[in-house]
UniProtKB/Swiss-Prot annotation:
Taxonomic source organism: Haemophilus influenzae
Biological process according to GO: cell adhesion involved in single-species biofilm formation
Main location: other
Signal peptide: 1-20
Keyword Metal-binding: no
Name of the featured protein: Major fimbrial subunit
Location of this chain's protein in the cell: Fimbrium
Stretches of the chain forming a coiled coil according to its record: none
GO cellular-component term (any): pilus
Family per similarity comment: Belongs to the fimbrial protein family.
High-level lineage: Bacteria, Pseudomonadati, Pseudomonadota, Gammaproteobacteria, Pasteurellales
Gene name as annotated: hifA
Record key words, sorted: Disulfide bond, Fimbrium, Signal
């Protein structure tokens, strides 16, 4: 009886250790970091919902993957940034820009460009997206989508561990502009262009992206 009881206790202890090890391997912690700042920029009323028309382009200009065509500038203007109140606080931003995102249209497989609309009537072009660029025409804007993964900072190695630096490529703030000395309207300039996924067919092109003011 004693041997049976001892054996049972050993088995229970072993099972407990196995369960503890299993639990350690099947759970974890995600720590989120952020900051609320005093700045209060607003999107100018007539810039909240904009339409940008790209000129028609021949499909031969978009016959190979990665071809771009018809770079078209557009502007989104901010106002009422209230720098006086912000400058009196330690929780102030130095720069402002826009955060472009689309859960539906961001195309992870094609450099986070914007997917063209599709239709059962087959009147939309295929193998073509819309790409957003910074105003210099050289820096691509990667639209944030539901599969964007580069917000995870590799230098935060444990729960509650503060970030020691800001990764320059994963804040996804476009049109970043210094706030110092800004008075009145603050225009932020960007470019939209066609982006080929391969041999583009003729048809309509239409896509959309959401944006929100973001600070640094």
């Amino acid at each position: 009886m004693k041997k049976t009881l001892l054996g049972s206790l050993i088995l229970l202890a072993f099972a407990g250790n196995v369960q503890a090890a299993a639990n350690a391997d099947t759970k974890g912690t995600v720590t989120f970091f952020g900051k609320v700042v005093e700045n209060t920029c607003q999107v100018k009323t007539d810039h909240k919902n904009r339409s940008v028309v790209l000129n028609d382009v021949g499909k031969n200009s978009l016959k190979d993957k990665g071809n771009t065509a018809m770079p078209t500038p557009f502007t989104i203007t901010l106002q009422n940034c209230n720098l006086t109140a912000a400058n009196s606080s330690t929780n102030k931003a130095n720069k402002v820009g826009l955060y472009f995102y689309s859960w539906e249209n961001a195309d992870k497989e094609n450099n986070f460009t914007l997917k063209n609309k599709t239709s059962t009537s087959n009147d939309f072009a295929t193998m073509v997206n819309i790409q957003l660029m910074e105003s210099d025409g050289t820096k691509e804007i990667k639209v944030v989508g539901k599969e964007t993964e580069d917000f995870v900072h590799k230098n935060a190695t444990g729960a509650g561990v503060a970030l020691t630096q800001t990764h320059p490529d994963n804040d996804h703030i476009s049109g970043s502009t210094q706030l110092t000395g800004v008075t009145g309207d603050l225009p932020l300039h960007f470019i939209a262009q066609y982006y080929s996924l391969g041999s583009t067919t003729a048809g309509k092109v239409q896509s959309s992206v959401d944006f929100q003011i973001a600070y640094e």
